[in-house]
């Protein structure tokens, strides 16, 4: 069984990441014609807290997820209107209590790892979420590293 490297970063627990992926899949499934298609089935989530209070969520999905989320102007004059999946995802994480749960797990982890620190007050003030995207099966010429619109 693979393990995360000990980098001093808190990696969000797998059951929580699985619930996060389920939420994003539901958002997409409710919006697309084929709710059982490749895009929905390709969704994976990695999440960790880096620095001190920044929750970094990595969305791994088929490459065209970014075009659906951000929108795009096509070579033939067509337009893909932005679907704002990530903004909906952020709202759902907050309303389901998952963001609070992640920071609670992180506080617990810090208290075990560094029992002398009093971090709970700091974490409540400075929480922020950033997103990264990793494309699955990108076509030739696909530019990785494009930011997800939130």
Where are these regions (language model features)?
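Short, Lys/Arg-rich flexible segments
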Residues: 1-150
């Amino acid at each position: 069984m693979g393990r995360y490297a000990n980098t001093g970063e808190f990696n969000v627990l797998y059951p929580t990441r699985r619930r996060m992926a389920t939420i994003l899949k539901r958002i997409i499934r409710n919006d697309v014609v084929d709710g059982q298609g490749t895009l929905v089935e390709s969704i994976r989530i990695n999440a960790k807290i880096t620095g001190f209070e920044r929750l970094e969520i990595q969305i791994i999905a088929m490459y065209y997820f970014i075009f659906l989320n951000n929108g795009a102007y096509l070579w033939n004059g067509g337009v893909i209107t932005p679907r704002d999946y990530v903004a909906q995802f952020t709202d759902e994480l907050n309303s389901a209590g998952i963001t609070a749960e992640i920071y609670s797990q992180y506080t617990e982890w810090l208290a075990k790892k560094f029992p002398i620190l009093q971090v709970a007050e700091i974490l409540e003030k400075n929480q922020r979420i950033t997103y990264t995207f990793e494309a699955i099966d990108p076509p030739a010429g696909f530019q990785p590293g494009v930011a997800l619109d939130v």
